[in-house]
């Protein structure tokens, strides 16, 4: 279901963008400090000398998400998942990147990917715990019915990662 939805809505988005984005039209200016933030993040992880290897933290994150955020879940499991994932996320402060080079550095790339996935995982787990209904791929066993009166809405979430951004 999710894959076909991505294909359908991706296609629709592409068609709509073709209508509203005109060739050679200027875009909004990027934030002046955007490059600085990206380079600071890159250097932060490139020079990380903690005791937690990226692969170990990633495996723990995946295990936690698989166990606590699968399609069928209940309130207790989700609450436990939020707590466990917070512990795993704290390990990002102790991450270890052995390769310091800037050329073909798969260790650094995997760490940056983990940082992105960790942010998404934390938000996904917290959002699932917060939603008190079942809808789509979210089957909450304590709330088996869809609740349009309270949950027919979008949820916005912010995540403060390593740099608070």
Predicted regions mapped to residue ranges:
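Glycine- and aromatic-enriched mobile tails/lids
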Residues: 1-165
């Amino acid at each position: 279901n999710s894959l076909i939805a991505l294909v359908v809505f991706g296609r629709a988005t592409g068609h709509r963008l073709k209508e509203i984005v005109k060739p050679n039209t200027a875009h909004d200016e990027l934030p002046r400090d955007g490059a600085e933030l990206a380079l600071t993040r890159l250097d932060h992880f490139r020079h990380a000398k903690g005791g937690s290897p990226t692969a170990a933290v990633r495996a723990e994150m995946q295990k936690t998400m698989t166990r606590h955020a699968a399609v069928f879940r209940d309130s207790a499991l989700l609450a436990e998942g939020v707590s466990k994932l917070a512990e795993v996320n704290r390990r990002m402060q102790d991450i270890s990147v052995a390769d310091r080079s800037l050329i073909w550095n798969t260790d650094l790339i995997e760490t940056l990917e983990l940082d992105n996935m960790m942010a998404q995982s934390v938000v996904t787990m917290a959002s699932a715990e917060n939603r008190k209904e079942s809808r789509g791929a979210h089957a909450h066993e304590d709330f088996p019915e869809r609740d349009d009166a309270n949950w027919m809405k979008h949820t916005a979430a912010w995540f403060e990662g390593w740099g608070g951004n």
